Amino acid sequence: MPDTAQHILTLSCPNRPGIVAAVATCLFEHGCNILDAQQFDSIETGQFFARIVFDRVGETAKYEALRTDFSRVAQDFGFKWLMRPRAEKKRVMILVSKSDHCLVDLVYRWRIGELDMAPVGIIANHPRETYAHIDLDGIPFHYLPVTRETKMEQEADVWRLIREAQADVVVLARYMQVLSDGLAAKLSGRCINIHHSFLPGFKGAKPYHQAHARGVKLIGATAHYVTSDLDEGPIIEQDVETISHRDTPDDLVRKGRDIERRVLARALRKHLEDRVLLDGQKTVVFAD
């Protein structure tokens, strides 16, 4: 381990006086230098949230001593906390169906270094030939077809691949299969979905065509954590785009794809950088 290494610390707990002082003192006593610190006090829930980036100077043993001492502080205040090397890449499994715009975008952003992650696999319910035009850059590809009769067996295989790859994060990149309550619970807080939001009245097939028929003036997308409540998990990122009466259904589909890919990428990046903390059914998202 290098003599100087940046680390990220995130924490949440019931709010009370002395939290910041205790954290800062512990880091200082172990020779750490705080580079960035953000915090939020939720008046509604009474919870305190913080994200701290710090430099650590010392050997591995000293780092373990820091973690040991910090765990005592965490116990005193009731922290839910994570401390990890900033350079450590989260392992990401991507699930996709026929629409590949989000998959293409995520792979491209990873390839150019915009998404600092370690892709461990792509699971699709369509064969590799469907994505023949995409250079997956060596990411393992798993074809798991699904029918109504085989859905539970297929989902068991999905979970097996996630476990075997030791994936930290699962991304539903326009994966058009609804996860069971059981799998959603297993992936709680680490499975991100992209949904065509701002179209709440248009469910089912061809939502953008339905929106066009109603003459909407805005379309958008929402990236959220997956829960057992379909498309109602804690929101991470959203965006919208203005629609004109001149726009055709194809225009709405095109604009919708663009919004979906950029919203999903932003949400994933924030998760990878530990900027998202859960606050009940909501999220606290610290700015970059």
Regions found by a protein language model. Give the residues of each.
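Short glycine-/aliphatic-rich beta-strand segments at the starts of folded cytosolic domains
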Residues: 2-14
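Solvent-exposed loop and beta-edge segments used for protein-protein assembly and interaction
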Residues: 3, 29, 44-46
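Alpha-helical macromolecular-interaction surfaces
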Residues: 21-22, 266
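Short, solvent-exposed amphipathic alpha-helical segments in soluble enzyme
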Residues: 24-28, 109-112
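Short secondary-structure junctions
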Residues: 28-34, 74-78
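Short edge beta-strands and adjacent turn/loop segments
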Residues: 33, 39-40
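One-carbon transfer enzymes
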Residues: 40-288
